[in-house]
Amino acid sequence: MRALAEQSVDNLLKLVKGEDDGVAAAEEDSGLRAKTTLVEDDLEAVNRLFRERKWTDGLPVVPPTRERVEAMLAGTPRKPEEVIDLVAPGFGAATVERIAINAVMAGCEPACMPVLIAAVEAVCSPEFNLQGIQATTNPVAVWLIVNGPVAKALDMNAGPNCLGQGNWANATLGRALRLILQNVGRALPGVMDRATHGQPGKYLFCCAENEEENPWEALHVERGLEAGQSAVTVVGAEGTTNMNTHSKIAAEIIRVVAETMKRPAGNDYRTGGEPWLVFSPEHADVL
């Protein structure tokens, strides 16, 4: 079995030296530029190799064979060699091909590619501060929220247990983004990822917004896009905290939210941050 895998190279050093981006040429007839690694035709052997080379999140992966990667690339018109951006903290070049490789490993389908490319563009934007998020001792994870027609097309979960298990698109998109952050950004746990304890959201953290039952503007519309557009939003999230109130009075719901948010010893209280609230339809309707 031929497993396509990215080279473990110090891309930042190569960029400083003016060298290439560290993507080795594959076989001449492959049409792909990633390094080709020959592996025994056995799923366990592939996963053992990937674990040894720290190319996984610790869970089994789908072997990114040439055929699977080429099929994944069919999900976008963008060229495989196009560099979307450099992913901190290792500043590896996130080519469309590399995004596709990690998407295959995570179990994505080709229709996921536009979402993943947009997510990479978002996390690499300067205002997101991916360097800080990836290298901090804080257990922060990247939360991916999807809006618009693409969320419907992928049948993403925006309802009960939307941040939990059970939905293929939520799970594979979130996992693919994490693999990109680790494999392209080189945020290896205990090396460049310095999280003291981490959190489960660092495996995957992805959902869609329930636009139909949202009494306010959809998130992407609130942030300047059109209602009919597809969009992704990325958030640096520490984790989830449940707020328990059965009140039907708006002021009481807001009081509970404020009391829960205070967290006097938390990072946001001490250094600032943007609270991120997720309301159930029942509470949103009251407010």
Residue ranges and their predicted role:
Residues S8, L12, V16, E28-L287:
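Non-transmembrane, aqueous-exposed alpha-helical and coiled segments at domain scale
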Residues M1-L4:
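Short, glycine-/small-residue-rich phosphate/pyrophosphate-handling segment
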